[in-house]
Amino acid sequence: MRPQHEPVVTQRAVRVECIPDGRPADLPAGTPAKITQALGGSFTLWVEGQLMRLRGADADAIGKRIPSIDLAPTAPTDSGLNGVRSLVWQTLKTCYDPEIPVDIVELGLVYVCDVLPMDGGQFRVTIQMTLTAPGCGMGESIADEVCDKVLALPQVGEAHVDIVFDPPWDRSMMSEGAMLTLGL
């Protein structure tokens, strides 16, 4: 049984990214679409047989409010290294591949997440992550989203995300919860 997808119509012209190649496209006002995924602050749309990613900042283009990602209920009280490390990992769990309804941590895409103190009480975050397929055109977009969300944390002064392919990703890297969600 296929999940129900919410039909929408663009209310203004908007820039989107085509999935899976990541190329930009412009949707004119009045374009019918279906929301197939609304996770991590962005939307995946089905438009005329093509999946497209709409940034959360452009949610008004489909009549939606800009999604907010609230980490406050689970934010650690420890403002030191361990607390910031925990907050960074929580933030990574708000990042999704636009084709898969499981976050990048549960998918096993994050290989390294180093959090190091800097002068002035802030932290430098270095992340090495992979993609489910080496040819995925959305890699840069996903990495940019990861970097932007981590940099939005007030404790983080610098963030860098590298896409790596060694070791190559495979399904065994997913959490049990991810496998259950995907029916594997």
Where are these regions (language model features)?
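Domain-level signature for proteins that mediate thiol-based redox and metal-cofactor handling
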Residues: 1-184
